[in-house]
From Swiss-Prot:
Keywords: ATP-binding, Chaperone, Cytoplasm, Isomerase, Nucleotide-binding. It catalyses: ATP + H2O + a folded polypeptide = ADP + phosphate + an unfolded polypeptide. SUPFAM superfamilies: GroEL apical domain-like, GroEL equatorial domain-like, GroEL-intermediate domain like. Belongs to the chaperonin (HSP60) family. Pfam families: Cpn60_TCP1 (PF00118). Residues 525-546 are annotated as: Disordered. This is Chaperonin GroEL. HAMAP family: CH60 (MF_00600). Forms a cylinder of 14 subunits composed of two heptameric rings stacked back-to-back. Interacts with the co-chaperonin GroES. Its EC number is 5.6.1.7. It is found in: Cytoplasm. Together with its co-chaperonin GroES, plays an essential role in assisting protein folding. The GroEL-GroES system forms a nano-cage that allows encapsulation of the non-native substrate proteins and provides a physical environment optimized to promote and accelerate protein folding. The gene is groEL.
């Protein structure tokens, strides 16, 4: 396959065109007065969104060289989304500004490698300054403000996230699902819930709700199948003598064992329920261990030399309340020791730090939440499917922003923190060529404010000038109310993690693009002309006709 190669000035021009095309489509969404983008879908109704990364992911350009520039900026948005979950539009605006200013200097003959070193140094200075400006999140009010800003000033969403975080704690898991109604609401699952229901509907105690509810019940945790009743006689007799209730969690309960449990339940001899163990393979073993620690049970497992027939009531755990429906089991207020639970939480946190797999991280965080707090589900509803999808995007952004804020703290929003932090560049020393890179970053840090102002129908230069007249680091422009004010008091705040990731990723990709001198792409395929048909005047086979 033949290739097309382009060099130096031509290459940079192509990259800049691609960068500008993508960034111009994305940056209209920035700020409280940013606009929506409508995206055509190959099936279903068009998607309306104000989420930068969603817009960026849809863009593919026809010209291969320009597309390379666009794809590299798309990488900036995606990486920022993966790390911080928000700030994708800011990252795109910064990447465009850094590359645009840098390309001018490289074209004028400056050394791109020295400019890159200057950019990297300046970014390091700004990040240190952002950390020193950071304020920890205090109380649910600030959590609600962060959520509202990321959800395009939707205070209802912000408050909902703050309430959910209050209920499940900062370690808890908050998930977002589409609602079947037009209402958006939060439901909280207290205690530990796993996705396994009762093995027989005969275990149900509440026929109206189709639930088996056990109060002050023992919990048996076993890692193998239970087929024979004789293995369980000892435990069942011990539980029956005390007149207590019992939940059996095992790989499976089948045949004679299940039939005997059902008969005893129907006769009223035993108040009992049985469910399958959650998860698969190694994850199942870990989750059974979690349940055992939460309830104060021992995992009955031959791996540790415990057999079911030798188990006694002392090996069982206890929970104040257990609710089992056809799909889920919820264990509330287990009797596990606080120290054991904290030790297990610490162990899972260490595993989260060590693992590099996003899937494993997600599953470990779910286990952590079930042990440490609980799970909150936000059901997003709206009158139409199009609006519901747009709202779901905003809720996801808001959730990610609030988590980031809790992690690393907050700074003044509206692009102000970057502008204030960039003033530190003037007080730092750079070599002559590196100074150009530092100047590029200083100029790029003004760009988010300029764009927020432009989207609000104002002149960015005038807004910048007004902000810089006041030396307070929290003083800035509130585009929602069109006022110059103390942004933190007004609740216009950004998570430090979001601002940091946006700048780091934008500078990383843009400075690499500046050092590009050659571009190679596949040559477009030439359309081959259709072969002429045999015969005279293209009418072969018809010569005998008059």
């Amino acid at each position: 396959m033949s290739k097309v190669i382009t060099f130096s000035e031509d290459a940079r021009t192509h990259i800049l065109k691609g960068v500008n095309t993508l960034a111009n489509a994305v940056k209209v969404t920035l700020g409280p007065k940013g606009r929506n983008v409508v995206i055509d879908k190959s099936f279903g109704s068009p998607l309306i969104t104000k989420d930068g990364v969603t817009v960026a992911k849809e863009i593919e350009l026809e010209n291969k060289f320009e597309n390379m520039g666009a794809q590299m900026v798309k990488e900036v948005a995606s990486k920022t989304n993966d790390e911080a979950g928000d700030g994708t539009t800011t990252a795109t605006v910064l990447a465009q500004a850094i590359y645009r200013e840098g390309a001018k200097l490289v074209s004028a003959g400056h050394n791109p490698m020295s400019i890159k070193r200057g950019i990297d140094k300046a970014v390091g200075i700004i990040i240190e300054e952002l950390k020193s400006m950071s304020k920890p999140v205090k109380g649910s009010n600030e959590v609600a403000q962060v959520g509202a800003i990321s959800a395009n000033n939707d205070k209802e969403i912000g408050q909902m996230l703050a309430d959910a975080m209050d209920k499940v704690g900062r370690e808890g898991v908050i998930t977002i699902e589409e609602s079947k109604t037009a209402k958006t609401e939060v439901t909280v699952v207290e205690g530990m819930q796993f996705d396994r229901g009762y093995l027989s509907p005969y275990f149900v105690t509440n026929a109206e709700r189709m639930e088996a509810v056990l109060e002050n019940a023992y919990v048996l945790v076993y890692d193998k199948k239970i087929s024979s009743m004789k293995d369980m006689i000892g435990i069942l007799e011990g539980v029956a003598k005390q007149g207590r209730q019992l939940l059996i969690i095992a790989e499976d309960v089948e045949g004679e064992a299940l039939a005997t449990l059902v008969v005893n339940k129907l006769r009223g001899t035993l108040h009992i329920a049985a469910v399958k163990a959650p998860g698969f393979g190694d994850r199942r073993k870990a989750m059974l261990e979690d349940i055992a620690i939460l309830t104060g049970a021992k995992v009955i497992s031959e791996d540790v030399g415990l057999k079911l027939e030798a188990a006694t009531v002392a090996d069982l755990g206890v929970a104040k309340r257990i609710v089992v429906d056809k799909d889920n089991t919820t264990i509330i207020d287990g009797a596990g020791k606080k120290n054991d639970i904290n030790g297990r939480v610490g162990q899972i946190k260490a595993q989260i730090e060590e693992t590099s797999s996003d899937y494993d991280k997600e599953k470990l965080k779910e286990r952590l939440a079930k042990l440490a707090g609980g799970v909150a589900v936000i059901h997003v509803g709206a009158p139409s499917e199009v609006e519901m999808k747009e709202k779901k995007h905003r809720v996801e952004d808001a959730l990610n922003a609030t988590r980031a804020a809790v992690e690393e703290g907050i700074v003044a929003g509206g692009g102000t923190a970057l502008l204030r932090a960039s003033t530190k560049i003037d007080k730092s020393k750079f070599s002559e060529e590196e100074q150009f890179g530092a100047t590029i970053i200083k100029r790029a840090c003004e760009e988010p404010i300029r764009q927020i102002a432009a989207n609000a129908g104002l002149d960015g230069a005038i807004v910048l000038d007004r902000i810089l007249q006041n030396k307070s680091t929290t003083w800035g422009f509130n585009a929602y109310s069109d006022e110059y004010t103390d942004l933190i008091k007004d609740g216009v705040i950004d998570p430090v993690k979001v601002v940091r990731c946006a700048l780091t990723n934008a500078a990383s990709v843009s400075s690499l693009m500046l050092t590009t001198e050659t571009m190679i792409a596949e040559a477009p395929k030439k359309e081959s002309a259709a072969p002429a048909m045999p015969g005279h005047d293209g009418m072969g086979g018809m010569g005998g006709m008059m």
